[in-house]
C-alpha cells in the first residue's frame, strides 16, 4: 500500500525536462483536464506553422500531391493502431460525435435488428437513439455487458444488430475488456436470442493515453477524436470501418467529391465505389489532417519507444501511475474526526492498468459528511490556478449510477432548475455532479500535489485559527435600529475598482449612472475580468459629474483623465462589438491613449477600453429592465450586518497578513447599494425594497463565484469567504440580492439615490 501512495515516473530525467520545456506557457497553472482535451506542445505548433509557411497545400480535389499526402496520413493513423488499409477504412470526420452520428444515419438494420448501447455512454451515443433505423432500442447495464465475457452461446442469425460501448469511460476512466468485442461478434448478447451483433467501439477517451491494438481486437467500427491525443488540431476525428462491415453502411446524403455522376435536371446520381470516397463529403480539413503528422512526430520524440514498449504504451503507464497516486492520496485524506474528506466514484481501485485509465472522479465531503458542491470546488481550484472539470461530463448514465440517483431523482433535479452544464451543484443536499481530474503525458506529480494541497487547505479544518474572527471585526462597528443606505458604490469599468459615494448619485434607465458603462477587452476583443487579471481591482475610476470626466488611478501610474463628452454618439467614433455574459454588445472604442495607459497598468499588451453605446439596449430576462454591462441586474444590494455575520463564521483567515476590516470584506462582494440592518440576512426575505422615495423589485439572490475571494485592496486571492458561504448555505453559493428599479424615468429627468436614506424591505 505504501508503494501505491508514492509516485515513480516512467520517464527518464532528461525526458521529463524536455517535456516540461514544451509546456512552459502553463507557468503556474496546474492543468488537470486531459480527458476534456490534452495540450499541444510548443514545438508541435511551430512545426505545423513552418509546414504551412513552406509548402503549397492545394484543395485535394485540385492537387494530387495533397491527396497523396492525405493518404499518407491515413496510413500513419492506421499504423498507430497497428492495422492497415486492407483491414480498415479511415473516414475523416469532425470528431467522435460526428462519427457516431454518421454511423447512426448510415447503419442498415435488418427488420428485426436491435440497437443496444451501454448506459454508461457519452451523450453522443445516447443521441444515436433519435436517428437509428430501428425501433428496437435497448440500454444495457455495465454488469450485464461484463457477463458477456463468460458467454458461450453462438450467434447464427442473419439479423444485423448494433451495440455501442466505450473502450474507456470518460466519467472515471474505467476500461472495458476489449475481449468483449470478439465475444459479442461471435456469441451475440444474452437475452437477444441468436441475433448477430456488430460492435462499435467509442474509443475517444481510451486512445488519448492507451494503445488500441486493432490487429488483436477488431471492432466493426471505431470512433475517435484527434485532439484527445495531440491537443491539436481540434474539429477532426475519424470513423474506422472494418472491411467486413463496409456493406452494412448505406449513405443517403451526398456532397461534393463523393459521386461518379450527379445530374441537376434529373434526380439521378451514382456514388463512388471506395467507402472513403463515398462518405467524405466536400473538401476535407486537409491542413488539419496534415498537422496530424506533427502530432505523431512530437509524441514519439518526447516519449520515445523503448524495448518492447511503444510510445503510447509508455504514456499509458505514466498516466495510470499518476492516477493511482492521486486516487490513493485523496482516499487517505481524513477530517479531524476520522471521516473521509473525499468520496470517490470508481469501479476499480487502480490495481490494474488494463482496467483503469488516468482519470479520478470524486466529490468532497464536509466534516459532518455532507457534500461540498462541485461548483464551489471549481471556484476554489480556479483560485489556486488549477484547471479541472466538474458536472456529469456528458455521461448521464455513469453519473447517475455513481451518484446513486434514480430516474425520479434526476427528473426532480431538472424540475428544480438543474440542467447540464450549470452550477446548480446541490439539490436537497445531494450532488448533481462531481469533480473530475485527468492526466496526460505532460502531467507532473507536482500538478497533483497542487490539487491535494488545495483540498487539504480548503476543506480540512484546522483546530487552531489565527484569531482574525468576529470579535475583532464587530467591535469597531455599531448596529442601526432602522435599515439605512450607508454607501453607494459604482463600478464605471466592469471588474475594476469601486467609486464610493457617501452623499447622493443619479440614476439612469440602466441603473446607477455610469455604473459598468465601460469594459476592458484584450487584443482579441474578449472582455477581461478579475478572474483572469486580479490586478484590475487596482484601477480605480472616479466620475466628476460637473466636468463629465472619468479619472483613472493606479498605484504605479499617473492619473489619466478621460473626457466623457468626447465619447458622444455625435463624434467621430469607432464602433465595435464585444461579448459580455453571453450577450453581444455594441460599444465605442475610447481611443489609443487610454488603451496604452490601461495596458501599462495591467502589464498586458493590446488592451482596449470600450464604452457601451448609448443606443445599446441590453436586458436581463427575469426583470426585463435595461442593464449596462453588469452580469444580470441593475443593482446589487449588500447588507453590512450579513457580512459581519459571515465573518464570524470564517474559521481561519490564515492567508492574510493583517486583520481584515469590515470595509475590506464588504468590498469583496462588489455591491452597489451597501445597507445596514438591525439583523443579519433579513434581506433574503425581501421581495420589494424602498430606499427613500424610490422603489425596487428584488430579482433574486446573487450567485457568488471566486471573485469574492479577491481582496479588492491588493488583488491577493484567498479561499475565504467563498468556502464558508458554501458550508453555511449547504452548497448554495449565494450572498446579496439583485434589484431593479420599478419606475425608471425615460424622459431624461434625473432621479437620485441619497445615502443615509431609510431602507424598507417588504417580504410580500
Curated annotation (Swiss-Prot):
It catalyses: Mo-molybdopterin + L-cysteine + AH2 = thio-Mo-molybdopterin + L-alanine + A + H2O. The active site is at residue 394. Coiled coil: none annotated. The keyword Transferase applies. Keywords: Molybdenum cofactor biosynthesis, Pyridoxal phosphate, Transferase. SUPFAM superfamilies: MOSC N-terminal domain-like, PK beta-barrel domain-like, PLP-dependent transferases. It is an enzyme of class 2 (transferase). Residues 607-762 form the MOSC domain. GO terms for biological process: Mo-molybdopterin cofactor biosynthetic process; molybdopterin cofactor metabolic process. This is Molybdenum cofactor sulfurase 3. The lineage of its organism: Eukaryota, Metazoa, Ecdysozoa, Arthropoda, Hexapoda. The gene is mal3.
